[in-house]
Amino acid sequence: MVETKGKGYAKALTSEERDKKFRETLWYLVVQSGRSERQICQQLGHNSGYINKLLNGNADPSYKGILELAEYFNVGIRELFGEK
């Protein structure tokens, strides 16, 4: 959510903004983990290109995939989408 100036409420992100935030956050988490995309895919039980497809916007994670990523990186679902 984005805080609007002076209004005291948050504005919902567009789907494009949310997708971009997800990709940016996922990239950050992958880099911070010190693991390769392939290693993460193997540990999650996905094919070797799964993370790359998510990062490039060529695939959308399923609800199960979102839960797996959040658990793997030890973050909340909202944090995975760039919210604090």
Where do the language-model regions lie?
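Short, basic-rich loop-to-helix N-cap that marks the start of a DNA-contacting helix
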Residues: N58-E71
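Short C-terminal boundary/hinge segments that cap the last helix of small helical domains
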Residues: N74-K84
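Recognition helix of helix-turn-helix/homeodomain-like DNA-binding domains
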Residues: G45-P61, E83
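Short alpha-helical "recognition helix" segments of helix-turn-helix
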Residues: S36-C41, L69
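Residues in the helix-turn-helix
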Residues: Q39, Y50, E79
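Alpha-helical residues within the helix-turn-helix
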Residues: V31, Q42, E71
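A short, Lys/Arg-rich alpha-helix, primarily the initiator
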Residues: V2-G34
